[in-house]
From Swiss-Prot, chain B:
The protein's name in its UniProt record: ATP phosphoribosyltransferase
Source species of the chain: Syntrophomonas wolfei subsp. wolfei (strain DSM 2245B / Goettingen)
UniProt-listed Enzyme Commission number(s): 2.4.2.17
Pathway(s) where this gene product acts: Amino-acid biosynthesis; L-histidine biosynthesis; L-histidine from 5-phospho-alpha-D-ribose 1-diphosphate: step 1/9
Biological role stated in the UniProt entry: Catalyzes the condensation of ATP and 5-phosphoribose 1-diphosphate to form N'-(5'-phosphoribosyl)-ATP (PR-ATP). Has a crucial role in the pathway because the rate of histidine biosynthesis seems to be controlled primarily by regulation of HisG enzymatic activity.
NCBIfam families cross-referenced by the UniProt entry: hisG (TIGR00070)
UniProt-listed GO biological process terms: L-histidine biosynthetic process
Catalytic activities: 1-(5-phospho-beta-D-ribosyl)-ATP + diphosphate = 5-phospho-alpha-D-ribose 1-diphosphate + ATP
Higher taxonomy: Bacteria, Bacillati, Bacillota, Clostridia, Eubacteriales
GO molecular function: ATP binding; ATP phosphoribosyltransferase activity
The gene coding this protein: hisG
Amino acid sequence: MKSRKISRGLRDLLPPELKVRRFMEEKAAALFASYAYEEVMTPTFEYLEVVEMGTGGNIREELFLFMDREGGILSLRPEMTTGIARLAATHLRDAVFPQRLYYLSNSFRYVQPHLAQYREFWQAGIELLGAEGVRADAEVITIAVKALQEMGLDNFKISLNQIAIFNSLLDDSGLNREEKDCIRSLVENKDLVELSRVLESLDIDDELKETIAILPVLHGGIEVLKRLPYVEKNQRALAAVQELREVYETLQLCGVIDHIVVDMGVLRGLDYYTGTVFEGYSPELGYGLLGGGRYDHLLGKFGFPCPATGFALGMDRLALLLKHPALQKAPRYLVGGKDFAAVIARAEELRKQGFAVEIDVEGKSRQELERKLEGRENCITGGLIYV
Amino acid sequence: MYDDYLTIALSKGTLLEPTLEVFKKLKLPGEGINDKSRSMVFTYDNERVKYIMCRPTDVPTYVEQGAADLGIVGKDVIVEQARDVFEMVDLQYGYCRFVVAVPEAIKNITLKDLNYKRAATKFPVIAENFFRSQGLQVEIIKLHGNIELAPLMGLADMIVDLVSTGRTLKENRLVELIKIMDSTTRLICNRVSYRTKHQQIQPLIENMQKLSTGGSA
């Protein structure tokens, strides 16, 4: 057997890539911890019925499915939030809320692989469980902004929306389930051409049509909320707009407003979101960097009703933007010599001082080692010590 | 790599001329562009606009990956490729329609009689989705051109193809059995560019919408 194949969409990570990854993980973990979040881990695969509590069964073709020997259907986790909701509903029933949890984990989706989209992907994320309201939303969004900043990114935007605006308008539209699903998917995919055609054919209030048609393209500062003519007629939508304003104002207090835009087209793909939602983008990459929002009903599906909000940051994508992160590395020495006991002693001494030491295990002469060092000055920054 | 130019992927071929006419009306630069020259990139520094010349089937790829912010391409290509891009404006020109066509000799056949028959097409995704949505099992034979030849030579019982005037069908003694969908030219947009270059893109979209719905920009 000489097969060197790996399954499509997977990859090996070599030291240079892994250094960047660990750098990101350390920054993320330190930031999350500074906001009093604590790390959790959930199993890499779960029962399909658990996974679909979160995904709603819409993305079954994206799941890696297999069976256990008792006939249960299992899925590699396609995201982390559902597993953490299950974890909280199982283990944290008696805990004091709000609970703040974070994770650094891999998830799996059977997607078309391309740059920045792999079938195994790594995320850093947080979940704030048991807190309602705009302050909790603002905390999570603030941490998202700071996470990107900590990792050295400054040119990025977080698009902010309140999903209940769109949902309330659609719920009260008098349309049937099929029509609603159709409009939802057209708005999510920003197929404006088909959307305007479908709206044209529907028998609903003209102002409502106009509002639904404008939602996917409404983008800008908080003032864009004035451009929703129909919202005044829908109490729930109006309340959601008011909440979005409050989140925006709170983010001003948090000092991150420079990175925030209101974007009514952000609906997020997963079924579980209920309130404030957001996504992060950099102009240097054609794909989103992070996404999250409020999901107040998910824990209830596991028998533990509890409001929640959170986000996940795609580390594979972010790594593409961090070409030269300020990686700290200890000076590295190469230690060699005839007397191996002396070599070991010297190496230990240097290691104790915090240096990285590579010892010559091949018993080479000074000249040979000097030759070996040529071209590796960037790596062996401390140089050669021959004892 | 990021720059503040707006990059637009243009479809070479029949769509180019009407596209440039629209651009002219929108006061977008366009001097010297043609798809005959060797240049594939046209840059206009004053206007901060860049055009790239692509095969129509490549336009959604450039836009999805963010190598271009916007693209001009037919709905037929968008549907066949199912790329993750925003579809912003129907530019109306470049009309054609997807049809199922059969040889004249069996023109009175009904759709359900096509179950378990063979269809030749350049658009396997559209063909497959259509037949499935009708509850039919049809064997799709993917060809790269001259689809009309397939039924003549007994390779397929029918074809799924793009038709604009219907002349080619007639010349090959094929008749349109059913229309699957209409297609016109669309403006598509990268998901992220739409957000990060919103101030450049949104006015352009609005002007195009006005223009294509009959008003003037």
